[in-house]
């Protein structure tokens, strides 16, 4: 028998999927890829709660007698019976070809047949196996082999840490989904997370002093009942100061409004539903037109050290998003999430219309590593910032940390300073910083290339 060649060692020898659980206790898909060399890669996919309508389809069984319809046995079966036979024997380093083959096998525009959760699990596991076989870190493999960047120096990511949860991510009466802190005054990942941890615990102390609950939402942030966004922002500013930092200089604030969640398609108005249901808002006053919503967001940026606003308007309100970006985009990062759903074609439309100046990147919105990288590159070519993101239903998989560093996106949002599925990503970023040493750069305020932030 002849010895295996170097190329043969990268061939996929085995591939299988199985069911695991996400951070909300619902099933999700895991995949293991084994190569001829004996190296393996394993990936687990996340799941979102507030999902954009244009996202690739997360395949669920729909059987009400099993996991209330949220089982993933069909997605697992699709990997084991449909995808695996076609991929075994292929070279794991040919990521683009493998992803293209899975897209072809699915044959639908939104991966509805095999499921984006099935396809993504395989896509990520293949990359991890290939990195392992090349005896290199995943971020280096992605940067130099998959993206062809040939890099030795990397940009570490400024984290957006979700310290107050609302919207679809918490059982409280806050309509905005995420209130985040960005430690922009730090000079390293280690210092950034120190600042974030201290602010997080200062906020917890403040909430207790005010008699507000400190229960956590899906992403590890606190989920108190508050009357308005302003109350959450006041608490954040006070917590930043209590931790010994300067709001708007050391630490700035980022919002994920997730406005699609309270946009009424019939009336074309933004109805602050959770607050109204709790009878803390006047229904007439808090049913806002697009112009009123933009004015409200502008007012918030004038009153608080806000540097970034995600999904400030509905994913259906393209004209409004263009106006929002024209109004605030010179000094504020305007991020599109539901608007684009990490879809390269939709991202290109956004660039043409100047709908935002930044894009949120979620692997499971599009369903393959190759398409995700394409969306990142479209944003880079347009001089937009890119924010790599987790989902509210997460696992201990840390791929997004490696992807953020590999693509030098400069920003990541992956939850608060609690819940181990969130902390796992931050710990991975610390490992990467340690591995890179002097070849790692934390940009802080310089992460914003296309806006002129107004620092305090």
Swiss-Prot record:
Q: What are the alphabetically sorted keywords of the record? A: Cytoplasm, Glycolysis, Lyase, Magnesium, Metal-binding, Secreted
Q: Where does (2R)-2-phosphoglycerate bind?
A: 177, 362, 391-392, 413
The record's similarity note reads: Belongs to the enolase family.
**What GO MF terms are annotated?**
magnesium ion binding; phosphopyruvate hydratase activity
- Supply the source organism for this entry: Mycoplasma pneumoniae (strain ATCC 29342 / M129 / Subtype 1)
Q: Which residues form the active site?
A: 219, 362
Subcellular location, record wording:
Cytoplasm; Secreted; Cell surface
Catalytic activity, reaction form: (2R)-2-phosphoglycerate = phosphoenolpyruvate + H2O
Which region is the signal sequence? none
Q: Write the protein's name.
A: Enolase
Note the InterPro entries from the entry. Answer: Enolase (IPR000941), Enolase-like_C_sf (IPR036849), Enolase-like_N (IPR029017), Enolase_C (IPR020810), Enolase_CS (IPR020809), Enolase_N (IPR020811)
């Amino acid at each position: 028998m002849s010895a295996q060649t170097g190329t043969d060692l990268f061939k996929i020898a085995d591939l299988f999927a199985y069911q695991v659980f996400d951070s909300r206790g619902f099933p999700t898909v895991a995949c293991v890829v084994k190569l001829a060399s004996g190296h393996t890669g394993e990936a687990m996919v996340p799941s979102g709660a507030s999902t954009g309508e244009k996202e690739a389809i997360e395949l669920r069984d729909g059987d009400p007698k099993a996991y209330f319809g949220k089982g993933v046995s069909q997605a697992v079966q699709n990997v084991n019976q449909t995808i695996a036979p076609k991929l075994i024997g292929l070279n794991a380093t040919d990521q683009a070809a493998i992803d293209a083959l899975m897209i072809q096998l699915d044959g639908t525009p939104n991966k509805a047949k095999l499921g984006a959760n099935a396809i993504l699990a395989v896509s990520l596991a293949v990359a991890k196996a290939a990195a392992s076989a090349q005896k290199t870190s995943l971020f280096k493999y992605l940067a130099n082999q998959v993206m062809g960047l040939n890099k030795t120096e990397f940009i570490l990511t400024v984290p957006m840490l979700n310290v107050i949860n609302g919207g679809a991510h918490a059982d409280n009466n806050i309509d905005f989904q995420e209130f985040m802190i960005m430690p922009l005054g730090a000079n390293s990942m280690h210092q950034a997370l120190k600042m974030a941890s201290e602010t997080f615990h200062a906020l917890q102390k403040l909430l207790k002093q005010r008699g507000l609950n400190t229960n956590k939402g899906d992403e590890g942030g606190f989920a108190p009942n508050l009357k308005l966004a302003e109350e959450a922002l006041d608490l954040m500013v006070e917590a930043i100061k209590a931790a010994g930092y300067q709001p708007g200089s050391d630490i700035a604030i980022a919002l994920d409004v997730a406005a699609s969640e309270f946009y009424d398609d019939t009336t074309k108005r933004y109805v602050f539903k959770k607050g109204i249901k709790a009878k803390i808002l006047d229904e007439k006053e808090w049913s806002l037109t697009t112009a009123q919503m933009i004015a409200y967001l502008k007012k918030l940026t004038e009153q608080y050290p806000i540097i970034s606003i995600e999904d400030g308007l509905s994913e259906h309100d393209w004209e409004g998003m263009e106006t929002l970006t024209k109004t605030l985009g010179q000094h504020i990062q305007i991020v599109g999430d539901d608007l684009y759903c990490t879809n390269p074609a939709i991202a290109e439309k956004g660039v043409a219309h100047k709908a935002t100046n930044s894009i949120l990147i979620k692997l499971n919105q599009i369903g393959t590593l190759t398409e995700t990288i394409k969306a990142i590159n479209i944003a880079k070519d347009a001089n937009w910032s890119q924010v790599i993101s987790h989902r509210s239903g997460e696992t201990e998989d840390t791929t997004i940390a490696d992807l953020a560093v590999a693509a030098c996106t400069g920003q990541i949002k992956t939850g608060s300073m609690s819940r181990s599925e969130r902390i796992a990503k931050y710990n991975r970023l610390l490992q990467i910083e340690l591995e890179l040493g002097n070849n790692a750069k934390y940009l802080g305020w310089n992460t914003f290339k296309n806006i002129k932030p107004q620092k305090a």
